[in-house]
Amino acid sequence: MKRLLTGLKPTGNLTLGNYIGAIKPLVDLANTNEYEILLFVADLHALTVYQEPDLLRDRIKKFIAMYLACGVDPSKVTIYIQSDNTYIPAISWILECNTYYGEASRMIQFKEKSKCCDNFSIGLLTYPVLMAADILYCDADFVPVGVDQKQHVELARDIAIRFNKKYGETFNIPAPLITKLGTKIKDLKHPDKKMSKSEDNPSGVISLFDEPSSIIKKIKGATTDSDNLVYFDEENKPGISNLLNIASVMTGRSIDDLVSEFKNSGYGTFKTYVGEVTANKISEIQEKYNKLLNSSEIDEILNSGLNKSINLAKTKYEDMKKKVGLN
């Protein structure tokens, strides 16, 4: 069975966009039983910018509970916290010593984020190498990524090939799995932009922690066009198309089926429907989340996942140490 690695960074706020674009597709992928899946909380990656310590700690636990509440099955997905596996940073250092500055500085995200300030951390430059360590220590075959992250998987491949050539076969060569993850959900107020968990305008973003009344209010206030006909046309009707995508995922109904029912009903009726089905679905998730949050089940799941992760990483690290001359 091929091994697949994916991560979640505990920053910002989990949104409906995260659920539809990343969490639900992960659940669906796990249910195919085609892959051995590892899911890690990328808390070390979060430190490339300052995080308030208590808030970060709290968010890590909440994110794990929410992923589980959304249907991630720990019997099918190995879940662990990145920083709990201390072999990973050690592996990362050896990989850094086999990575060129030019490679790291060419990463598009580094170029973009380093423009915003003069005093960015070295971690912003080197975190793609830490990402390579995340991928390579467990010999992942596939890493599901969007187009913007593909470059980082390609760097991991280059590092692995170089290390193998220099020191002998050590790493499996991973491949990016370019995801069309579910549907990209747009901001309710600005349907030309994706719904972001760091969005400054909360009225356009549905959080998985929002109250049902707030969810309904936000959807009723979603930006739409003026012709009052419900049909799918992302170019000319981005707002309504976004709501159709949301309703389709929330209910399991096809977009054609929804259009058939609501095409001539008017936007008010359609928005009310979308608001109610979305609020109901998120309420179900929140009920599971509240039961999980302070339960011992999370600790048991994380301990089990960490043990597997450590066993894989220790074996890889000892092999690397021997090959580079450290023992």
Describe the function of each predicted region.
Residues 2-5, 10-133, 277, 286:
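N-terminal Rossmann-like or analogous alpha/beta NTP/dinucleotide-binding catalytic cores
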Residues 40-43, 139, 181:
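A secondary-structure boundary/capping signal
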Residues 52-53, 143-146, 230:
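Short, polar/flexible loop-turn hinges at active-site or ligand-entry regions and domain interfaces
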Residues 107-163, 167, 187:
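Internal, conserved structured core segments that host functional sites
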Residues 151, 157-327:
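Conserved nucleotide- and phosphate/pyrophosphate-binding catalytic cores
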